[in-house]
């Protein structure tokens, strides 16, 4: 199977690459349209700011390429947020617009931001991405912005208030947490995605 990690220039790819390799795959990192469009599975990881990430997406001519993908795509952390419409970060950043939902800064409710560490995730029953993962399993988060619960939410988490922990629209999936840092539950989620 052809597994590709999109080379956005805004992610630490080694941990994602290693996590995929542990399942027996050899992922390629690429932004070449011929490689990306022929991939069986695509990963869109991201760390840092939405502005820097979108600058890289545009500079590397990935904007239209990502939106043209028809195979399963998994956005991780900031990569999930990039699927949204607009981030409140940096006075507003236009995102890919695949999911018609904004990404506001989380309300702190007296809790520290960023939301960092292990938290429980509650998936919708029957979603293939979470098959075999128990309701309330712990995943590892590091973020200050989060997509609200919306019609494309497939899993929720609570940090002062509920937010979207995972999302799906058509072939595009996103997880706000880091599956590559989330132990057995994260490994199972990656396996589910790779075997879809």
UniProtKB/Swiss-Prot annotation:
Show where the Glutamine amidotransferase type-1 domain sits.
2-196
Q: What is its main location?
A: cytoplasm
Pathway field of the UniProt record reads: Amino-acid biosynthesis; L-histidine biosynthesis; L-histidine from 5-phospho-alpha-D-ribose 1-diphosphate: step 5/9
Per the UniProt entry, what is one GO biological process? L-histidine biosynthetic process
Q: Does the keyword Amino-acid biosynthesis apply?
A: yes
Q: Which reaction does it catalyse?
A: 5-[(5-phospho-1-deoxy-D-ribulos-1-ylimino)methylamino]-1-(5-phospho-beta-D-ribosyl)imidazole-4-carboxamide + L-glutamine = D-erythro-1-(imidazol-4-yl)glycerol 3-phosphate + 5-amino-1-(5-phospho-beta-D-ribosyl)imidazole-4-carboxamide + L-glutamate + H(+); L-glutamine + H2O = L-glutamate + NH4(+)
- EC number annotated for this UniProt entry: 4.3.2.10, 3.5.1.2
InterPro entries (alphabetical): Class_I_gatase-like, GATASE, Imidazole-glycPsynth_HisH
| UniProt superkingdom | Bacteria
SUPFAM superfamilies per UniProt: Class I glutamine amidotransferase-like
Subcellular localization is given as: Cytoplasm
Q: Which CDD domains match?
A: GATase1_IGP_Synthase
Alphabetically sorted, this entry's keywords are: Amino-acid biosynthesis, Cytoplasm, Glutamine amidotransferase, Histidine biosynthesis, Hydrolase, Lyase
**Pfam families recorded:** GATase (PF00117)
A GO MF annotation of the entry reads: lyase activity
HAMAP family assigned to the protein according to its UniProt record, in alphabetical order: HisH
Q: What is this protein called?
A: Imidazole glycerol phosphate synthase subunit HisH
Q: Organism source for this protein? A: Escherichia coli O157:H7
Q: Which gene codes for it?
A: hisH
């Amino acid at each position: 199977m052809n597994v590709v990690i999109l080379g956005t220039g805004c992610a630490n790819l080694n941990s994602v690459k290693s996590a995929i390799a542990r399942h027996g795959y050899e992922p390629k990192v690429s932004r070449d349209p011929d490689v990306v469009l022929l991939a069986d599975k695509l990963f869109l990881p991201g760390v840092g700011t939405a502005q820097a990430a979108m600058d890289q997406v545009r500079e590397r001519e990935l904007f239209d390429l990502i939106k043209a993908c028809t195979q399963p795509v998994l956005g991780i952390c900031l990569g999930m947020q990039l699927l949204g419409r607009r981030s409140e970060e940096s006075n507003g950043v236009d995102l890919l617009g695949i999911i018609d939902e904004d990404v506001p800064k989380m309300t702190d409710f007296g809790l520290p931001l960023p939301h960092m560490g292990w938290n429980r995730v509650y998936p919708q029953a029957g979603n293939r991405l979470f098959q075999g993962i128990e309701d309330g399993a712990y995943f590892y988060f590091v973020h200050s912005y989060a997509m609200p619960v919306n019609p494309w939410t497939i899993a929720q988490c609570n940090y002062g208030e509920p937010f979207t922990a995972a999302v799906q629209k058509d072939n595009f999936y996103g997880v706000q947490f880091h599956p590559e840092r989330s132990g057995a539950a994260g490994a199972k989620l990656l396996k589910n995605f790779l075997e879809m």
